[in-house]
Amino acid sequence: MRPLFSLLLLILSSFSLCEKKKIIYLIRHGETNFNTDPVPKVRGRINVPLNEEGIAHCKAAGDFLANENIGKIYYSAIPRAKQSADCVAEHHNGPVELVEEPLVIDISWGIYEGKTYMEAFGDETGGDLIHHPEKLIVPEGETFYAVMDRLRLFFVKFWESDEEVCTIVSHGAITNVLSLMFLQAPLEKFWSMYMSACGVSKVQMKSIYSFTIEYWNANYFLKEGEKKYLKK
């Protein structure tokens, strides 16, 4: 029986070795004044540039990943994400191809963009945003379900490609939705895995529906980035 058992183990291990796996790095864009103002504002797809801290943090994220194989960087078309992707690429030790990817653009907050959160959501809608995101409806905007659908299309495209690794530079709402997809969690858990500005996550992809999070929201390097890159 022992030779048969050994053969079975060999067959099973060969299947394991042949299992297709890919790696996704996920980076949230750097800080903007809309994030850090005493009364923060809804951003979405309006153009808000990175502030000095945001630029320093992006450079630090690039340093953090400098020796990793990060593949192509797929970035949201919104300039703050492109600016963040550029900083990361500039501080990587190898050549990095940057690709604008419409499927990872920020959620459209419709008529709420540019307003303070209280102006946009008030008490009633704000309650849905915080406590019942699955019920949230944004006039002239997007639902979280629509965001999930387009992110799944990105997964399909990446999975079917020859690429083994990629990096996504996107936005807070997108990283929240991605965390739900990685964990197969319901939209009610939208706020459970929040990523800080310029946080970095690494995820193993086993299929378009199966993922393992290796680490989430690494950000310990940001303070060092402030010391190194902020103007005195």
Regions picked out by a protein language model, each given a short descriptive name:
Residues 18-23, 94, 107-118, 180-232:
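Acidic, low-complexity terminal tails and accessory targeting/binding regions
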Residues 30, 165, 172, 219:
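Active-site metal-binding loops of divalent metal-dependent hydrolases
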Residues 23-29:
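Short, hydrophobic/glycine-enriched beta-strand segments
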Residues 9-17:
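Hydrophobic h-region of N-terminal signal peptides that target proteins for export
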Residues 24, 163-169:
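Residue-level preference for the first positions of well-ordered beta-strands
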Residues 31-82, 88, 137-152:
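Loop-to-helix element that buttresses phosphate recognition and phosphoryl-transfer chemistry
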Residues 1-7:
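Sec-dependent signal peptide recognition
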Residues 60-127, 193:
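Phosphate-coordination/substrate-recognition cap region in phosphate-metabolizing enzymes
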